[in-house]
């Protein structure tokens, strides 16, 4: 029996919701835990979990982009129409990212420097990724060709990241332009807490390649097998990257595993692919769609809850004193944020239906 379109898309919303929860816990513990609590095992695992929300959001943006593109192609839209539609949406997200920076700058007065207006954040890079993917789809027409091109671009971005952060830095560019390449911002070296094109766009293009695979005729007819294949491939990719990283030789003059390594990119991508397969199985056979699913609900309003929660965790209206709480206190705050964002999401959905 074939799954309905709603069932097919639920696991993508569920994955976005999971990314939201991982984002909440990362931000809450990072903002609120005291210096002594930051030495706890909880904080260590929280930071490790914090390496996945951005890859998930970008990867899922790539899949959604492929779904939209495939829908337009099935409607026999021209290549030019597809490019205009997708690039326009990417530009809208990029503009929202700029607006978000303006909001944070104004709410951060009198302490926030004007340079924060030009900080490269996750919304900026999602918008840029979508515009770049739109341009790629104009050059590579056809599903198979587009999938191969997207996978190739993801690989090239991952491989080019280490030198663009170190030995091949485009230092002649103004800092606000170089920051989109390697996240240097106003500092002497690239900053790992920013979201430049290298390496972050690679996750979006990887998602685009996966999305085109999932929209193929074979994958539509054998969806469970297709997701299982992706999950197994992801596990194999992560294992292979771990093996490569253990080798003593390196092709890069400067090697930074946690921030620029192609191996770390491949490990995270492999885990994300396995999570995608797991999310699909959970929504199809598990409790993911037994009645109301908080993760699916959050996933459908991920932009809204991202936008709102930041100010109540990191901003002027933080519900707890920053860097002053025990693990228990910060965990209670996390529960409050999760509940509030879920209620906000439900309220937004109800208003949309009226």
Regions found by a protein language model. Give the residues of each.
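Alpha-helical transmembrane segments and their immediate juxtamembrane cytosolic regions
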Residues: 1-354
């Amino acid at each position: 029996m074939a799954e309905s379109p709603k069932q097919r898309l639920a696991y993508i919303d569920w994955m976005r919701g999971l990314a939201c929860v991982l984002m909440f816990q990362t931000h809450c513990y990072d903002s609120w835990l005291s210096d002594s609590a930051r030495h706890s095992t909880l904080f260590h695992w929280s930071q490790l979990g914090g390496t996945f929300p951005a890859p998930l959001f970008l990867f899922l943006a790539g899949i959604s982009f492929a779904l939209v593109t495939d829908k337009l192609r099935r409607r026999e839209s021209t290549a030019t129409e597809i490019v205009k539609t997708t690039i326009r949406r990417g530009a809208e997200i990029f503009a929202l990212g700029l607006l978000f920076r303006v909001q944070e700058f104004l709410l951060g007065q009198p302490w926030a420097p004007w340079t924060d207006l030009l900080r490269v954040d996750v919304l900026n890079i999602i918008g840029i990724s979508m515009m770049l993917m739109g341009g790629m789809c104009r050059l590579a027409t056809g599903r198979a060709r587009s999938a191969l091109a997207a996978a190739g671009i993801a690989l090239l971005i991952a491989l080019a990241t280490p030198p663009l952060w170190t030995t091949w830095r485009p230092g002649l560019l103004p800092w606000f332009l170089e920051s989109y390449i390697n996240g240097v911002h106003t500092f002497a070296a690239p900053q790992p807490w920013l979201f430049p094109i290298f390496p972050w766009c690679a996750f979006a293009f990887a998602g685009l390649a996966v999305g085109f695979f999932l929209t193929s005729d074979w994958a539509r007819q054998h969806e469970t097998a297709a997701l299982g294949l992706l999950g197994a491939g992801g596990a194999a990719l992560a294992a292979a990257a771990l093996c490569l990283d253990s080798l003593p030789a390196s092709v890069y003059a400067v090697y930074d595993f946690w921030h620029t390594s192609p191996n770390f990119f491949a490990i995270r991508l492999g885990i994300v692919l396995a999570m995608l397969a797991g999310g699909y199985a959970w929504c199809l056979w598990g409790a993911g769609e037994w009645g109301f699913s908080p993760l699916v609900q959050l996933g459908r309003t991920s932009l809204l809850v991202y936008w709102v929660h930041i100010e109540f965790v990191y901003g002027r209206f933080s519900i707890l004193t920053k860097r002053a709480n025990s693990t228990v206190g910060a965990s209670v705050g996390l529960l409050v944020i999760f509940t509030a964002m879920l209620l906000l999401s439900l309220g937004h959905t109800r208003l949309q239906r009226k």
